Structures are given as structure tokens and as C-alpha cells.
Amino acid sequence: MKLWGGRFRESESELMEEFNASLSFDKKLYEEDIEGSIAHVKMLNKCKIINNEECEEILSGLKSLYKDIRSGKLKIEGDYEDIHSFVEVNLIDRIGAVGKKLHTARSRNDQVAVDMKMYVKKSSYIIIECINKLMETIKDKAENNHFIMPGYTHMQRAQVVTFTHHMMAYYSMFNRDKKRIDNAISNLNESPLGCCALAGTTYDTDREMTSKELGFSKPVDNFLDGVSDRDYIIEVLSAFSICMMHLSRLSEELIIWSTKEFSFIQMDDKFSTGSSIMPQKKNPDAAELIRGKTGRVYGDLIAMLTIMKGIPLAYNKDMQEDKEQFFDSFDTLKMCILVMDGMIATMTVKKEAMKEAVKGGFLNATDVADYLVNKGVAFRDAHKISGELVIYCENNDKAIEELNINEFKNFCNLFDEDVYEFINYNNVIKKGNKKIM
């Protein structure tokens, strides 16, 4: 069932119908399509393009369609080209010929553009809510596990940090992700409804009214731009991809920390799986799947950039491919955030394992150098002395803090008994701007 065909002598081939149809996936837009149609009908009535009785009949029909779809009474299926065809044809079946007036002063080009903008905006707000929940979980886990642990550069133990500070780094990352998505919402918040196919309409319509009715800040400035660009989807997918990158980095650390080699955390059974052959295995599959699905969201972004890169103005059918990319990214990101939230909330942080890792990594070597700087030694010389001290400790299987004062003085006679307090790991994180950790 199509909304066109008058100028054609022959019907599409079955192959072309199957190739061209999008109902199987754009049915997700039924709420937005009906909501946009309701706003459009109200505007047609206000502008005296349809009368009050016609307006009420169409509105009643649209609302009954929405109710029946929501309840499952009406299934979105059948021989329809897209969700727009499904809604309009079913409306006409219900209310008769007056339903044919719904599409006055509107094209599917501005119709699908407004549907997608509304869906992207709604979905983006859902992602922001999910990020907020994850951030609170991270903060709670961080604040309730204020333990020292190794901080790493190049995956080598570097300096002592706290588990709190380490986790709050991800809190900051996700906070920026949230801001990026919110900014993308601001950029897309202009209504394309009323642009029609590409050049507006000869009817004296009220785009300000439909824009306000649908929750947009204003109508788009340019008809061609309104129906032909999907940069707002690309911008949101870019923000989604960056968020997935942060989820993937966190997943990688959780995977490493959960190994016996590290044993910094223990994953809860609720977010772990086992092996079909090795009974002892407890695998961090949830984190691994998040890490893997990051590539999937990246792929959706690259697909959208590629779809749009060579399209002339205005609308082209290529743009039908925007929907599956966005739907997939939204569903994937939402699920990954929810799973990460569950993993963080239920995992156990192992204080003693982190503490032992700190002791074995010479993580106070920089503090030894700082101690000597406070005694008047130039930092570069202090750095050299501290490095030589580390070699001595490695050769003698000792931690720096285990050296006696005479061993310290063999490297520099400025060392005194106060060095032990200065390089104590629990004291180190309380000095200077480290206090924020």
C-alpha cells in the first residue's frame, strides 16, 4: 500500500517493493509519526485549511490508532511501504475520506525528518538518564572504597593513588559525555515540519505553532536544510561513540583487575559467566561484551558519515539508511550503560590486594626525590639518586621503605629519619594537591 502511484503505468516489481520498504524498522517511529500528525492537523485547522469537524475526526482517528498500537490490538505489519503509509492508510480505513486530508501541506520528507528528530531527542534524554545513574553508582562505589592502589602509566606501576580517585576519573569522563549529548540535543532542537518536500508550501501554514507543539525551540531556517541533512544524527552518534569508548576503557580495567594476576576486584556472579569445559572459570563476559560492542557503535557512526558524504540537496532515498544505524546505537549504548552500572554496583573491591601491589612497585620513588628536593637538592639530581636507590632495592629484594637509614645515607647524606614518614604511602596522598584524592 503506497501513498503514490498516479503517474506510473506499471507497479513495482516484488523485488523492488521488498528492497524499498522500511516498515520493518521504521515502525519504531509510530509514536513520533502520530504525534507529529496530531500537531500538523491542529495547525491545518488553526490556519483554516481544514474545518473544525474535519480536525476533530482526524484527531480522534489518530488517537484511536495510537491507543490500539500501544495496547497491541493493532499490529504494525502488512504490505505498507513505511510507517507513514501504515498510519495514513489505517486512518483512512477508520474515518473514511476525511483522513485523506491529513497529508495536506506536508511531504514524507519533512514528516520523516521531524519523526527522526523527535526520536533522537527522546532517546538522547534516556541515555542521559542512564549516564546519571551510572555516575551515581561510580561515585558511591568510589567513596565507599577509599583505599590506596597503584596508579599506572604504560601499564607499569607509577605512583600511589586511591581507588576513589581512579574511579572518579571515569565519573568525569561520563559527565563530559552527558554534556556532549545535551549539546547535540540543543543543536537538533529545530523543527523541519512545514518544509514539505524541499520548497515549503503554497498554503499559509504556521510552522511556529507546530514547532512549539512538538517541543522544539523554533522552526528550521532553511527548507532544503531541514529535509536533507542528518548531521544531528551524526553528532549524537559521535557523542554515543565517545561514551562507548569510555565504557570500553573502564571494561578493560575491570577485566584486568579481576584476573588472579591482579585480583583488585571480584566480579559478582550476576555479571559473570562460566566455561563449558573448565569448571573453575569465572569469566568477565559482561565487560568483554561492552568492549566488543564499542566497535559496533563506531561502525554505526562511520556508516552514517559514509551515507551522507555524497548526497546532493535535497532529500535522497539514501537517508532511509539513517534509522537502523541510530536505533542500533541507541539500543546498544543503553544496554551497555545498564550492564556497567550493574557490574560496578555489585563488584567487590579487594583492599589488601591493592595495598600489596602498592608495596611491591616502588611507587614512592618520586616521593624520595621530592624529599631530597626539600633538602635543597636539584630535582634532576634527586631523580638520579632515587633511581639508583630503586636499583639497589631490586638487587636486594627490598621495598624503599624497608631500607635502614644507613642504606639511605649511602646514596645521599641528606637522608634522615624523617624520610620514613615522608615516603609513607598513607602520608603521600595527603600532601600538596594530592589531598583531592
Swiss-Prot record:
Annotated InterPro entries: Arg_succ_lyase_C, Argininosuccinate_lyase, Fumarase/histidase_N, Fumarate_lyase_CS, Fumarate_lyase_fam, Fumarate_lyase_N, L-Aspartase-like
Keywords noted in UniProt: Amino-acid biosynthesis, Arginine biosynthesis, Cytoplasm, Lyase
EC number in record: 4.3.2.1
Top EC class of this enzyme: lyase
GO terms for MF: argininosuccinate lyase activity
Catalytic activity annotation: 2-(N(omega)-L-arginino)succinate = fumarate + L-arginine
Subcellular location: Cytoplasm
Gene3D superfamilies given in the database record: Fumarase/aspartase (C-terminal domain), Fumarase/aspartase (Central domain), Fumarase/aspartase (N-terminal domain)
One Gene Ontology cellular component annotation held by this UniProt entry: cytosol
Entry's family note: Belongs to the lyase 1 family. Argininosuccinate lyase subfamily.
Record protein name field: Argininosuccinate lyase
Lineage: Bacteria, Bacillati, Bacillota, Clostridia, Eubacteriales
Gene: argH
